[in-house]
Amino acid sequence: MEDLLRVGVISSTHGIKGEVKVFPTTDDMNRFKKLKMVTLDTGKEQKELEIENVKFFKQFVILKFKGIDNINDIEKYKGKDLLISRENAVDLAEGEFFIFDLIGLQAEEEDGNSLGELTEVLQTGANDVFVIKTKQGKEILIPYIDDCVKKIDLNEKKLVVHLIPGLVE
């Protein structure tokens, strides 16, 4: 499991006093109000940044970091990820998972027949859909509903599914 979780990507600067526009990659933008620190992944190193101020503008979060007071000091980080530790992640309810924890799970039917690897989670609005890539390179789409997903075991890296008629040709 990953230790650092991406909560946003710096999309551009905002003004000339070192603020940045951040595209949030979290379901709840308001979580930025509770964060005190983030880790900036520059690609070469990871820097701890203290959040001084949080504002919202349309679909963006505007962040001001302590000690960065000039557009020139932050401009070079455009397109870079902002990360938090797993300890600072939101608490999940029963049956909820972080998508990145699901990627790579081995999918199998209830009888133990191997189907392949979970490679992607599509967020459709109604329910998520798991994309399982078979050894033959085909994709099986499994809706994340109780009728289809019987068990998710992160420790064993296993996903047990029930294939209802019509899911696989």
Swiss-Prot record:
InterPro entries: PRC_barrel-like_sf, PRC_RimM, RimM, RimM_N, RimM_N_sf, Transl_B-barrel_sf
GO CC list: cytoplasm; ribosome
TM annotation in the entry: none
Domain of life: Bacteria
Record bears the keyword Chloroplast: no
Domain PRC barrel: 94-167
GO biological process: ribosomal small subunit biogenesis; rRNA processing
Gene3D superfamilies according to UniProt: PRC-barrel domain, RimM
Subcellular locations according to the entry: Cytoplasm
Protein family according to the UniProt entry: Belongs to the RimM family.
Domain remark text: The PRC barrel domain binds ribosomal protein uS19.
Subunit structure, interactors included: Binds ribosomal protein uS19.
Role summary: An accessory protein needed during the final step in the assembly of 30S ribosomal subunit, possibly for assembly of the head region. Essential for efficient processing of 16S rRNA. May be needed both before and after RbfA during the maturation of 16S rRNA. It has affinity for free ribosomal 30S subunits but not for 70S ribosomes.
Full protein name: Ribosome maturation factor RimM
